Amino acid sequence: MGVLMSKRQTVEQVQKVSLAVSAFKDGLRDRPSIRRTGELPGSRRGTVEGSVQEVQEEKEAEAGTSVVQEESSAGRAAWERLRDGRGVEPEEFDRTGRFTPPAFIRPTRKLDDDKPPEICLEPREPVVNDEMCDVCEVWTAESLFPCRVCTRVFHDGCLRRMGYIQGDSAAEVMEMAHTETGWSCHYCDNINLLLTEEEMYSLTETFQRCKVIPDCSLTLEDFLRYRHQAAKRGDRDRALSEEQEEQAARQFAALDPEHRGYIEWSDFLSHESLLLLQQLRPQNSLLRLLTVKERERARATFLARGSGSTISEAECRRAQHSWFCKRFPEAPSCSVSISHVGPIADSSPASSSSKSQDKTLLPTEQESRFVDWPTFLQENVLYILAARPNSAAIHLKPPG
């Protein structure tokens, strides 16, 4: 009787075979080759002395290359993680009893990617989460953690075995996942995973030319230096103006909400991925990236802030800021602030105070101009995507 294999078991077996083949190829590549030309007269090859001499030559060759290999192995591993869409992997990560993360395949753009998607204001779309855990594909009566962006759900134990939550972070995930703020899964938390292979190659090439080291934090000086070098990539005579440099400094402050003086690599990578999407993708392609939950939150915001089928331009601008309103959980045990994925209720004190501040920032002429639903989506799509990560950083600061 044949043995039935699930899709996940098949993927894991393919991954194991691929890893074995890759390890074998790496071993052949790293093994030093000793080139022997002609045998000299009086050669000791084939004797005991000759064997000892060959072993000594191999040890000397290995010692000469070991230093170079150790120096480049860390950098090579970081670039490979960046290319494959994987995060930082601690050296002391205990993989005993862990699940093998599924192989990630970067998305590809379809032929009709730039055509306008059908995202109507009415009727509303039903939002239904998956019934089975995305990792083990098993339904249990235990509490499942829903993602605030997609419809995936996860078990606490599965997230631990995958290495996505460690230590006491499980309690914080449990608190956030069942609140209005919500929690983003490992797929939605990493905006870089939205890039295609070609877009990722372009971003990696920019990092290499600007000498950006992956998995390393950046200070304000590093961030501004990178901005200047990236601006000169296409035109050597081009440089950032004072206004652009001030804007970059404000963006750095938004990426460093705790005022530590540096920004994490994951926040920097998300910010640069958003800028690349803004540069290379048309608006219709960006709209196709929105999930059903994000589209529903956008509808709720438009209907709450607008009047009928239109909304004032001032309210549209305020909505761009509202995606990043910080909501601190009421539970004192959770000390992590998460970026809000939707606007705060209009009746809340935080909403009224933010509106009064926005009115001082926005011109009064915008109150008389109105935008429709498609325009509202186009002007907010990037900021909706930027609010996906769990980090408290603002990965794309709205103007104003």
Curated annotation (Swiss-Prot):
A zinc finger (PHD-type) spans 129-190. The keyword Heme does not apply. One of its GO terms (cellular component) is nucleus. Residues 78-97 have a biased composition (Basic and acidic residues). The modification Phosphothreonine is found at T47. Keywords: Lipoprotein, Metal-binding, Methylation, Myristate, Phosphoprotein, Zinc, Zinc-finger. Pfam families: zf-RING_15. A lipid is attached at G2 (N-myristoyl glycine). The modification Phosphoserine is found at S43, S51. GO terms for molecular function: transcription corepressor activity; zinc ion binding. Residues 30-108 are annotated as: Disordered. The modification Omega-N-methylarginine is found at R36. This is PHD finger protein 24. It comes from Pongo abelii (Sumatran orangutan). The gene is PHF24.
